[in-house]
């Protein structure tokens, strides 16, 4: 929530995913969709936890991703390839600013989201891809999703649903680290380790 102002203006004011179409139109008429976005993020943070990532290059925001369980995303039921699978979290949007494109930041964003979700016990991430990939859209281009490891699970001529099994994103090293954490954690007396 502290970094919300670092989102590009178009995303900061966009509530395409966060509100149903009627509520979205009302927010636009009231003139403050950014306030609705902030309320949605705050509510999701309190109830579910972190729902976004921003990547910075030399202190400047270079890209972002927003994600949440489909239950928190009213628009997720409006697609011809709905619903999102019960064991998955929805990658709502992801974008790398043009001046930072081509440097692997998109892959890094998806890997960061995947690592976060894996720690929470989530099995997969799904997204509705946009085969037209229109500039300025809050939809994720399908070719981007495919390039970072997603597979099509429900084809469609415009909005296929794609899925990334989270185990496939973790490297061998990360698997070993997780196994060691589990092993050492299980041998630690309860109460010896406390959150800071």
What are these regions (language model features)?
Residues 138, 154-194:
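C-terminal "cap" of GNAT-fold acetyltransferases
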Residues 110, 117-136:
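Conserved GNAT acetyl-CoA-binding A-motif
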Residues 11-52, 56-57:
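Active-site rim helix/loop that mediates acceptor-substrate recognition in acyltransferases
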Residues 128, 142-163:
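Conserved catalytic-core motifs of GNAT/GCN5-like acyltransferases
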Residues 31, 43-50, 56-93, 139:
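Conserved acyl-donor/pantetheine-binding loop and adjacent beta-alpha core of acyl/acetyltransferases
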Residues 104, 140-141:
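Glycine-rich phosphate-binding loop
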Residues 93-96, 102-118:
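Conserved acetyl-CoA-binding loop-helix of GNAT-fold acetyltransferases
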Residues 59, 131-132, 159:
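Conserved beta-strand edge residues that scaffold enzyme active sites
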């Amino acid at each position: 929530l502290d970094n919300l102002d670092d989102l590009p203006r178009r995303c900061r004011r966009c509530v395409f995913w966060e509100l149903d179409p009627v509520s979205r139109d009302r927010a636009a008429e009231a003139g403050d969709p950014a306030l609705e976005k902030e309320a949605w993020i705050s509510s999701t943070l309190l109830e579910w936890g972190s729902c976004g990532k921003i990547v910075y290059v030399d202190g400047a925001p270079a890209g972002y991703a927003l994600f949440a369980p489909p239950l928190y995303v009213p628009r997720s039921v409006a697609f011809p390839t709905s619903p999102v699978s019960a064991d998955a979290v929805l990658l709502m949007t992801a974008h790398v600013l043009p001046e930072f494109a081509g440097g692997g930041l998109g892959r890094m964003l998806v890997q960061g989201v995947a690592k976060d979700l894996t720690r929470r016990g989530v099995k997969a991430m799904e997204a509705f891809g946009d085969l037209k990939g229109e500039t300025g859209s809050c939809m994720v281009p399908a070719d981007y999703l495919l390039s970072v490891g997603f597979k099509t699970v429900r084809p469609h001529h415009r909005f296929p649903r794609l899925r990334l099994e989270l185990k496939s994103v973790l490297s061998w090293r990360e698997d070993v680290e997780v196994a060691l954490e589990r092993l050492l954690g299980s041998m630690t007396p309860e109460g010896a380790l406390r959150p800071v």
